[in-house]
Design a protein with these regions (language model features):
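Noncatalytic, basic helical substrate-engagement surface that gates or grips nucleic-acid strands
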Residues: 1-130, 134-156, 231-234, 240-248, ...
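Conserved RNase H-like, two-metal-ion catalytic cores of nucleic-acid enzymes
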Residues: 3, 7, 13-47, 54, ...
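Short alpha-helix plus adjacent loop in nuclease-associated cores
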Residues: 71-85, 141-166, 222, 371-394, ...
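Accessory alpha-helical DNA-binding modules that contact the DNA backbone or grooves
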Residues: 145, 167-170, 177-237, 247, ...
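Conserved "right-hand" nucleotidyltransferase catalytic core of DNA-directed polymerases
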Residues: 228-390, 437, 453, 465, ...
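C-terminal structured "cap/appendage" subdomains that terminate the fold
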Residues: 252-254, 858-914
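Conserved catalytic core of nucleic-acid polymerases
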Residues: 486-489, 544, 648, 652-653, ...
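Active-site palm subdomain of RNA-directed nucleic acid polymerases
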Residues: 518-531, 535, 850, 854-876, ...
């Protein structure tokens, strides 16, 4: 029998289980490790000698499903640092006992499980999947069953029917309708599990349901299905597990438990006598001492680093907690402040534009904190009653009276963690946060010091720097409380205070450790103080400004997109000969490769790259690609953006300052960075962002910024001369590649080829990739690249020097000193990817540095003196967007252009271009 262990399912169950608080003697959390092995040991002990086992984990959060639906799983919070650490320990422990561990990039662990189970499903082979994940119930068949070890329960067809109300082969269609809030699968709004099962039982399949939509008697349900057809089929793509993951090189041998190695791991790294005793009892060393068969898989992306070294044992940090409920207590605590004050707000929710203060925590050092309760309430037990205000609290007005002089005192540094959020909350209360100064932020300090080496959440940093495990927010509430029901203002003050105070004290302690590290590097400190730190309050103001959105235009666009999708669907169905689900890769593969006999690659893939290779073989391919493009824009923007318009008619995105490796900003709710720039449909989306009456929008961006920075960083003489002279860089490149004399014009197709190479070479494009983009043979593409590199030898030198430095140091630097970490370069399986990233990283990072500093300069010198005339409302890639009174637009556009062009003195000129229009776009 083949047993597939769903590593993620067991890891999360163990992490949140009864042993979750266990630690080693040095304080390292081990509860999840203990729980994981405690669950699997009895299963392994019952195995037959010829049974095979493999444990599968996710390689990363990002998979092909985000290409289908970018919001997929984006509702999930940051993975706790101690969960990541324990996950790594578990993988090491599995290898120690002889268990193969498998991770495949680009897909989820569930897809790997589905592929292995399907391939193993023959008349003689049974597959058992150890999991508690309902998403795997679609795999249940005569030869595949699930096993929940915690409940000692097999899950076969009867149990699936009990759970979903349908057969296993119908589970996918039920999930397509009901969606899944935990994974952000949209489904059909208004249709829950019961109604979904009822519909699928009535019509058999999702396809048959939509083919007979008129037979749905309930008018409301029929309308929901009709209006959300595309979402249903997109959801089906998301919930359908792949069964064709390439595992051709995978070989599994019968499982052999290695007792000596297992005991060494448990005793050294988990320090659990009970687990060691259980292993000795179940797997006596005299019977289980043979080394396990070697397991290798070329595509394996499981990174199993060394177990974290044991730090010097430290006692748990003891924090003095002062609860402030009177003016005298507040005044007494504020007298303790010397030169530094850490501050944190507790709020009514997580909406930074509208939520209010519940309480404020302060810390005058790393072990002396205070909590000021302000708006705690007592929840009414009466369904129709209202909550009452908790006693013994200060009013916000009183707190403001005494705290505001401290916040605005130029001699006291105010320290926060993700301080931008706290400033938003204070602004919601009417506080003028522009006067809060000086400030610093431990999240930004962590980011500039260590970039992508680790996350920058407070809990993770506390564990990393201080060996301290913060109180978990969820632990303040009764077990099994839903996230939506966790309201801080309903907590008893005595329980809320230690949690709030700990955040402020830990922030203070982190500042004491990280700021000296930054101050030891003059170049990095200068970058931080002129770019990263001053940018934070500017981003806060951009978020508060928001951008006006045309709801009617978005709704019209949604209608147009869905009409275009229907028209394309009809054309695609006509070309194929019958209707099918265009959103289904499986059905699409059957249509293209079986029925229409189009050439298929080894994996019979229907992803965008594969279809682009087939675009000249049949007109249906281009129509399918167009349908997908429109479907993505409809689902992500035209349908979604109206729901994100606030009461002021504006969309208030959130800018993330610490989420990319290169220093680029990103955004969420919505993600403005993903709106296509150079497509007609993307332009239509941008037109929905508008100026209010008597105002216009100014959009300013850098021209050919990455090529100009490449010319400067790599010291490319030809590029520098071209940019200084103002000549056409792509035309000049074409002359070099194709040896075109200066007295002859450059043919359009040759300039296009040169432009493609110019913008692709710094991304490490191959001859195969260039051939695909240019529509030429690989031999021709190779000749173009060779000619390009020969004509511009400085680029080859830059690439080789960067590769060498990145390989030796696992990082690269921008000219202004930002360190871009490349930890993947140490992993042989990911090294090629990391090296390609290293080539472009200094350029992309320097572009981010320039943009950050330009935003600071423009905000301070142009926006701040003219708040009634102009304000910044968006930043997207190398573009800034402003809202300006119409009569001043040209004046300010020219000032902004000048500021951007003069932000740095390089060996080539920086050029900025602007557009003035009532809409975002041309």
């Amino acid at each position: 029998m083949l047993t597939l262990i769903d590593g993620n399912s067991l890891l999360f169950r163990a992490y949140y289980g009864v042993h979750s608080r266990l630690t080693r003697s040095d304080g390292t959390p081990t509860g999840a490790v203990y729980g994981f092995f405690n669950m699997i040991l009895p299963i392994l002990a019952s195995a037959n000698p010829d049974d095979k086992f493999v444990c599968i984990f996710d390689a990363s959060r990002i998979t092909f499903r985000q290409d289908i639906y970018p919001q997929y799983k984006m509702n999930r919070s940051e993975t706790p640092a101690d969960l990541i650490t324990q996950g790594q320990m578990i993988q090491s422990g599995l290898m120690a006992i002889g268990m193969p561990v498998l991770c495949v990039p680009g897909v989820e662990a569930d897809d790997v499980i589905a592929t292995l189970a399907t391939k193993n499903c023959t008349n003689t082979n049974a597959t058992r999947i150890i999991t508690s994940d309902k998403d795997l119930m679609q795999l249940v068949s005569d030869c595949v069953y699930l096993y929940d070890g915690m409940k000692s329960r097999e899950i076969r067809e009867a149990q699936v029917l009990e759970k979903f109300g349908v057969r296993p082969d119908q589970v996918i269609d039920v999930q397509s309708l009901m969606g899944d809030s935990s994974d952000n699968v949209p489904g059909v709004p208004g249709i829950g599990p019961k109604k979904a099962a009822e519909l699928i039982n009535q019509f058999g399949t999702l396809d048959n349901l939509y083919a007979n939509l008129a037979d749905v008697k309930n008018e409301r349900i029929r309308g929901l299905l009709r209006d959300n057809r595309e979402m249903a089929y997109i959801s089906k793509q998301l919930v359908t597990l792949k069964t064709d993951v390439d595992l051709s090189d995978l070989n599994l041998a019968p499982f052999v438990f290695n007792t000596p190695s297992a005991l060494e791991f448990i005793r050294t790294n988990v320090e659990s006598n009970s687990l060691a005793t259980k292993i000795e009892k179940l797997f006596p060393a005299e019977q289980f001492s043979a080394p396990a068969p070697e397991f290798t898989f070329p595509g394996n992306a499981c990174e199993v680093p060394d177990i974290p070294p044991t730090p010097t044992p430290q006692p748990r940090r003891e924090i003095k907690c002062t609860l402030i409920t009177t003016i005298d207590e507040l005044q007494n605590y504020l007298t303790k402040i010397d030169r530094f004050l850490a501050i944190d707000t507790e709020t009514t929710g997580l909406n930074q534009i509208s939520d209010k203060i519940v309480g404020i925590s302060l810390a005058v050092n790393d072990i002396d904190g205070a909590y000021i309760p302000i708006r705690h309430r007592i929840k009414s037990n009466d369904l129709f009653g209202s909550d009452t205000t908790a006693p013994n609290q200060l009013t916000l007005e009183t707190v403001y009276t005494y705290l505001w002089p401290i916040l605005t005192n130029p001699n006291i540094l105010k320290i926060g963690h993700n301080l931008k959020y706290d400033l938003h909350i204070m602004a919601n209360e009417g506080w003028d946060t522009t006067k809060i100064s000086p400030i610093d932020d431990t999240m930004l300090l962590s980011y500039i010091l260590h970039g992508a080496l680790h996350g920058h959440g407070l809990d993770e940093l506390a564990l990393k720097y201080l060996g301290h495990e913060n109180i978990k927010f969820s632990s303040l509430f009764p077990p099994k409380t839903r996230d939506a029901d966790m309201h801080f203002d309903q907590l008893e003050i005595k329980n809320a205070a230690p949690y709030a105070i700990e955040d402020a004290c830990i922030c203070y302690a982190l500042y004491n450790m990280m700021r000296p590290e930054l101050d030891s590097d003059d170049k990095l400190r200068h970058l931080y103080e002129t770019c990263d730190l001053p940018l934070m309050p500017i981003l806060m103001q951009i978020e508060r400004n928001g951008v006006l959105a045309d709801r009617n235009k978005l709704n019209q666009l949604s209608t147009i997109f869905h009409e275009q999708m229907q028209k394309l669907s009809d054309e695609i169905w006509q070309l194929s000969g019958h209707e099918f689900n265009i959103a289904s890769p499986k059905q699409l593969g059957v249509i293209l490769f079986d029925e229409m006999q189009l050439p298929a690659n080894k994996k019979r893939s229907t992803d965008a790259d594969s279809l682009n290779e087939l675009i000249d073989t049949h007109p249906i391919v281009e129509k399918i690609l167009n349908w997908r493009s429109i479907a993505k824009l409809a689902g992500t923007y035209a349908d979604a953006l109206p729901r994100q318009i606030a009461s002021d008619g504006r969309i208030h995105t959130t800018y993330l300052q610490t989420s990319t490796n290169t220093g680029r900003l990103s955004s969420r709710d919505p993600n403005l960075q993903n709106i296509p720039i150079k497509t007609t449909l993307g332009e239509e989306i941008r037109k929905c962002f508008i100026a209010p009456p008597e105002h216009t929008l100014i959009s300013v961006d850098y021209s050919q910024i990455q090529l100009r920075l490449l010319a400067d960083i790599a010291n490319i003489k030809t590029f520098r001369e071209t940019f200084i002279s103002g000549a056409d860089i792509h035309e000049q490149t074409a002359r070099k590649i194709f040896n075109i004399p200066t007295d002859q014009p450059v043919p359009r197709e040759m300039r296009r080829a040169a432009k493609t190479v110019n913008f692709s070479i710094i991304y490490g494009i191959s001859s195969f990739g260039l051939a695909s983009q240019l529509g030429v043979s690989r031999a021709q593409a190779k000749q173009i690249i060779d000619s390009y590199m020969a004509g511009l030898p400085e680029i080859g030198k830059y690439i080789e020097n960067t590769k060498k430095f990145a390989t030796e140091h696992a990082c690269v630097y921008t000219p202004w000193g930002r360190r871009i970490e490349l930890p993947e370069i140490k992993n042989p399986r990911l090294r090629a990817y990391a090296i390609r990233a290293a080539i472009n990283a200094p350029i992309q990072g320097f572009e981010a540095d320039l943009m950050r500093r330009a935003m600071v300069e423009i905000a301070n010198n142009i926006i701040k003196p003219n708040p009634d005339k102009i304000r910044m409302i968006m930043q997207v890639h190398d573009e800034m967007v402003f809202e300006c009174r119409t009569e001043y637009a040209t004046e300010f556009a020219q000032k902004i252009k000048s500021a951007m062009e003069n932000i740095a003195q390089l060996s080539v000129p920086l050029v900025a271009e602007y557009v003035i229009a009532p809409i975002w776009g041309k």
